[in-house]
């Protein structure tokens, strides 16, 4: 199964709310349906998401689905080892990477100027942080 993202549109931009896939390396897209991905939602990669947000599903092959992805394949917690954020990201939501114990590598850009409270709480294994 390839990467799937639960997202919502905010006018001319997109917020990714949750990711799904059965592998530890996640490369987020720069755009979905022609709109720039500018935000990561609260608890996006955390196993402790309080409630599942509403949105549409985008798939890696470029299609959109209306149905919800299976939460058992959510890319969260110890399943996540490496994340590459696109240069279009401006905001990282609260507790976005909360308790991602196995996260070792994070690549992001200096365009991410709004990082929510507790975004990296519990990320004890990060040994490579790349900021472009």
What does each model-found stretch correspond to?
Residues 2-12, 20-38, 50-91, 101-114, ...:
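Structural signature of tandem-repeat unit edges
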Residues 43, 93-96, 116-121:
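Consensus positions within tandem repeat domains that build extended binding/scaffold surfaces
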Residues 44, 48-49:
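Short secondary-structure subsegments characteristic of cysteine-rich extracellular domains
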């Amino acid at each position: 199964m390839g990467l799937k993202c639960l997202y919502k549109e905010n006018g001319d931009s997109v917020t990714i709310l949750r990711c799904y896939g059965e592998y530890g390396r996640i490369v987020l897209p720069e755009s979905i349906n022609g709109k720039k991905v500018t935000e990561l939602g609260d608890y996006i990669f955390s196993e402790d998401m309080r409630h599942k947000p509403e949105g549409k599903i985008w798939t890696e092959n470029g299609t959109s689905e209306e149905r919800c992805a299976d939460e058992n394949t959510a890319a969260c917690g110890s399943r996540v080892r490496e994340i590459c954020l696109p240069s279009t990201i401006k905001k990282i939501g609260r507790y976005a990477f909360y308790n991602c114990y196995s996260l070792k590598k994070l690549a992001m850009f200096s365009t991410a100027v709004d990082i929510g409270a507790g975004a990296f709480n519990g990320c004890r294994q990060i040994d490579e942080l790349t900021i472009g």
